[in-house]
Amino acid sequence: MLFMKKKHPCRIRKRADFLAVRTGEKRRGPLFLLEVKSREQTAERESSLVARVGFTVTRRNGNAVKRNRIKRRLREAVRVGLTDDMEAGTDYVIVAHPDALHAPFTSLVNELSRRIKPKTKHQKRQQGNTNGI
């Protein structure tokens, strides 16, 4: 019996791919913004067997040392606990906020896992009704 091993997510490196994902769904959080787009929507030629992840840390987050540290923390958070939650054939771009540098690692992983999972219709309805009516 053959077992299919789940592939780790690949990295997004090209500007065109980052721009394509930018037009997809946005999931906001206190530590980062997660942009998600299915690769079928981007008409990608390559295989859609794995998820792809890109990281964006802008200059407003600090100098190069701080930006690189944020990227390392996010990469490790994705590697440690989120490869099972990511859908194959989907691109994810994580745009970091400055608070991601000093946030506890467990909260970073928990926030990522909460944002990676797609919302159901019921959750979207509950979130949209914030005025209590």
UniProtKB/Swiss-Prot annotation:
Cysteine pairings via disulfide bonds: none
Designated name of the protein: Ribonuclease P protein component
Primary enzyme class: hydrolase
E.C. code: 3.1.26.5
Chaperone keyword on record: no
Quaternary organization: Consists of a catalytic RNA component (M1 or rnpB) and a protein subunit.
Reactions listed under catalytic activity: Endonucleolytic cleavage of RNA, removing 5'-extranucleotides from tRNA precursor
Feature: compositional bias, Basic residues: 115-125
This protein's record includes keyword NAD: no
Family named by the database record: Belongs to the RnpA family.
Function per UniProt: RNaseP catalyzes the removal of the 5'-leader sequence from pre-tRNA to produce the mature 5'-terminus. It can also cleave other RNA substrates such as 4.5S RNA. The protein component plays an auxiliary but essential role in vivo by binding to the 5'-leader sequence and broadening the substrate specificity of the ribozyme.
GO CC, alphabetical: ribonuclease P complex
Pfam families hit by this protein: Ribonuclease_P
Highest taxon above the source species: Bacteria
Organism: Bartonella henselae (strain ATCC 49882 / DSM 28221 / CCUG 30454 / Houston 1) (Rochalimaea henselae)
Coiled coil, from the record: none
Region (Disordered): 114-133
PANTHER family (alphabetical): RIBONUCLEASE P PROTEIN COMPONENT (PTHR33992:SF1)
UniProt GO molecular function: 3'-tRNA processing endoribonuclease activity; ribonuclease P activity; tRNA binding
InterPro entries found in the cross-reference section: Ribosomal_Su5_D2-typ_SF (IPR020568), Ribsml_uS5_D2-typ_fold_subgr (IPR014721), RNase_P (IPR000100), RNase_P_CS (IPR020539)
UniProt-listed GO biological process terms: tRNA 5'-leader removal
Keywords: Endonuclease, Hydrolase, Nuclease, RNA-binding, tRNA processing
